[in-house]
């Protein structure tokens, strides 16, 4: 008697993002998720602070020195859109913003 057992991987593949620009929704806590695949592709897993360029309703918004928040078990990062920017441009939760670029901030050099 032969028994065949199917073994499935526990690893879920949601989506692979490896290049910018990237469109993403703003969470209810005013944070934006940068997927782990994009973090690895850009080589920014070691960064604590970054300069981020966003596009929202035709406006290009430059955020300097935003803190990249991380979880314990993944390479994904999140950052909060500052209140001043949210109020000025009307960015709210559920809105779609495009991440145009993410680059190391000068703040990284000061903190190490």
How would you describe each model-predicted region?
Residues 1-18, 87, 98-106, 110:
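Short linear interaction segments
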Residues 13-62:
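Acidic (E/D-rich), amphipathic helical modules within compact regulatory domains
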Residues 16-23, 67-70, 76:
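Short, compositionally biased strand/turn segments
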Residues 28-43, 73-89:
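Short beta-strand-centered segments at strand-helix junctions
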Residues 32, 59-63, 79-81, 106-108:
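Generic recognition of long tandem-repeat/solenoid scaffolds
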Residues 34, 65-67, 75, 93, ...:
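Exposed regions on extracellular, virion, or secretory-pathway luminal proteins
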Residues 43-59, 90-107:
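A short beta-strand-loop micro-motif that forms or neighbors metal/cofactor-
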Residues 60-71, 101-102:
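Short domain-boundary/entry signatures in modular proteins, especially
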């Amino acid at each position: 008697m032969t028994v065949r057992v199917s073994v499935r991987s526990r690893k879920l593949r949601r989506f692979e993002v490896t290049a910018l620009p990237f469109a993403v929704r703003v969470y209810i806590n005013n944070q934006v998720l940068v997927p782990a695949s994009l973090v690895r592709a850009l080589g920014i897993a070691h960064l604590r602070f970054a300069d981020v360029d966003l596009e929202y309703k035709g406006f290009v918004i430059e955020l300097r020195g935003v803190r990249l928040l991380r979880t314990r078990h993944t390479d994904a990062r999140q950052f909060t859109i500052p209140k001043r920017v949210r109020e000025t441009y009307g960015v709210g939760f559920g809105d779609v913003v495009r991440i145009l670029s993410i680059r190391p901030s000068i703040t990284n050099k000061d903190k190490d």
